[in-house]
Amino acid sequence: MFKTINKSITSILLFMISCYQKWFSPFFGPRCRFIPSCSSYGYEAITRHGPWKGGWLTLRRLSRCHPLTPCGCDPVPD
């Protein structure tokens, strides 16, 4: 049952990120200071690590994406 809940949460999160990438991101233009972009990072993190750890990694990444942080490459950890 827990596995089914994880899959459902993963699907919902990935759907939300995909909607953002398709419908909202084109209006805002490139804003992220990192490579890959925060939405791509979140999609990859949730796909690789599941909704809980991947979601936490995504939140940490989003908290670092601001003008006072230096730009650069920040891949999803293994």
Swiss-Prot record:
> What highest taxon heads this organism's lineage?
Bacteria
Q: Which GO terms describe its cellular component?
A: plasma membrane
What is the protein's major site of localization? membrane
Transmembrane residue ranges: none
Location in or out of the cell: Cell inner membrane
- UniProt keyword list: Cell inner membrane, Cell membrane, Membrane
Q: Which Pfam families match?
A: YidD
> InterPro entries, per this entry?
Membr_insert_effic_factor_YidD
Annotated membrane topology is: Peripheral membrane protein
Q: Does the keyword Membrane apply?
A: yes
Looking at the keywords, is Signal present?
Answer: no
Family, similarity comment: Belongs to the UPF0161 family.
* PANTHER family according to UniProt: MEMBRANE PROTEIN INSERTION EFFICIENCY FACTOR-RELATED
Its annotated function is as follows: Could be involved in insertion of integral membrane proteins into the membrane.
**Could you tell me what this protein is called?**
Putative membrane protein insertion efficiency factor
Q: Which organism is it from?
A: Prochlorococcus marinus subsp. pastoris (strain CCMP1986 / NIES-2087 / MED4)
